[in-house]
């Protein structure tokens, strides 16, 4: 694996010179191997190690290099045709392979090659970008978007129209992460490498980026870039220092544990916020 990483790192340093016409065989094979490993879930752009999320920047570099070495090509797609550098993940799937991998794909859901989809996942008409990782038992609902390199945990529900931000550039940026057993309400947006920790519930229409204040009304604490585990979050406002105006924020209205979540439905958690 180290040799593969070295090839990617070296090629990335001269990426401006690389074109589909002049890409050397070693680089091309290395990039294609990484994309295949991402596609199968053998590698992932970010993973939790000793309780901390670690981003493997060299894998992002490989994804970016894939855009340099590949030319646009016509892509067949049922009622339409497309023209892009990245093939579709399911282009060569037959019924046997779908059965073996054990997930459902509802037309016209689109998944790019280099994204991993785990067993028992359901993809309604949605979009999953290259480098993304969608773990077991997750529902990606209608018109939801999973951005490039985003990491989605087990048993997550991404409701209709949810946007999970992608991150290929800037290179140092970390991917957006939704941990296990989270619920993201309809039309919410989680972007810019924000981490929603395990068991959290995000209400409908909540927008969270790195600069969004995440206010815990029980403690008065303000978080940035991270929703603590077990949080129930709704959209809200905080007053300015001079009291003349208010600015948007996300509000943690309560904390719940796994036992409570098991007994109480998502709708009840969101409706009883007083």
Curated annotation (Swiss-Prot):
Entry GO MF terms: 2,3,4,5-tetrahydropyridine-2,6-dicarboxylate N-succinyltransferase activity; nucleotidyltransferase activity
Binding, substrate: 104, 141
Signal peptide: none
Enzyme class: transferase
Main location (coarse class): cytoplasm
Gene Ontology terms: cellular component: cytoplasm
Compartment annotation: Cytoplasm
CDD domains named among the record's database cross-references: LbH_THP_succinylT
Catalytic activity: (S)-2,3,4,5-tetrahydrodipicolinate + succinyl-CoA + H2O = (S)-2-succinylamino-6-oxoheptanedioate + CoA
Pathway note: Amino-acid biosynthesis; L-lysine biosynthesis via DAP pathway; LL-2,6-diaminopimelate from (S)-tetrahydrodipicolinate (succinylase route): step 1/3
EC number: 2.3.1.117
Pfam families: Hexapep_2, THDPS_N_2
Record key words, sorted: Acyltransferase, Amino-acid biosynthesis, Cytoplasm, Diaminopimelate biosynthesis, Lysine biosynthesis, Repeat, Transferase
Gene3D superfamilies assigned to the protein according to its UniProt record, in alphabetical order: Hexapeptide repeat proteins (2.160.10.10), Tetrahydrodipicolinate-N-succinyltransferase, N-terminal domain (1.10.166.10)
BP-aspect Gene Ontology terms: diaminopimelate biosynthetic process; lysine biosynthetic process via diaminopimelate
Protein family membership: Belongs to the transferase hexapeptide repeat family.
PANTHER family tied to this protein: 2,3,4,5-TETRAHYDROPYRIDINE-2,6-DICARBOXYLATE N-SUCCINYLTRANSFERASE (PTHR19136:SF52), MOLYBDENUM COFACTOR GUANYLYLTRANSFERASE (PTHR19136)
HAMAP family linked to this entry: DapD
Assembly and interaction partners: Homotrimer.
Protein name: 2,3,4,5-tetrahydropyridine-2,6-dicarboxylate N-succinyltransferase
């Amino acid at each position: 694996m180290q040799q593969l990483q070295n090839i990617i790192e070296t090629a990335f340093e001269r990426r401006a010179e690389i074109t589909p016409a002049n890409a050397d065989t070693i680089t091309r094979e290395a990039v294609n191997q990484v994309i295949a490993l991402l596609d199968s879930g053998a590698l992932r752009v970010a993973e939790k190690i000793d309780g901390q999320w670690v981003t493997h920047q060299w894998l992002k570099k490989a994804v970016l290099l894939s855009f340099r070495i590949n030319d646009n090509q016509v892509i067949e797609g049922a009622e339409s045709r497309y023209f892009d550098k990245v093939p579709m993940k399911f282009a060569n799937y037959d019924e046997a392979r779908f059965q073996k991998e054990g997930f459902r794909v509802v037309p016209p859901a689109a998944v790019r090659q280099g994204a991993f989809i785990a067993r028992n996942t359901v993809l309604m008409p949605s979009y999953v970008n290259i480098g993304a990782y969608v773990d077991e038992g997750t529902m990606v609902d209608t018109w939801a978007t999973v951005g490039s390199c985003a990491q989605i945990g087990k048993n997550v529900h991404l409701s209709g129209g949810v946007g999970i931000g992608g991150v290929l550039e800037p290179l140092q940026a970390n991917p957006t992460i939704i941990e296990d057993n989270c619920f993201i309400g309809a039309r919410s947006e989680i972007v810019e490498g924000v981490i929603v920790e395990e068991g959290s519930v995000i209400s409908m229409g909540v927008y969270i980026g790195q600069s969004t204040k995440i206010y815990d009304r029980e403690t008065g604490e303000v978080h940035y870039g991270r929703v603590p585990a077990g949080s129930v979050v709704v959209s809200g406002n905080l007053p300015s220092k001079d009291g003349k105006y208010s600015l948007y924020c996300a509000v943690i209205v309560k904390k719940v544990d796994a036992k409570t979540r098991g007994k109480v439905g998502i709708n009840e958690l969101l409706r009883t916020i007083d």
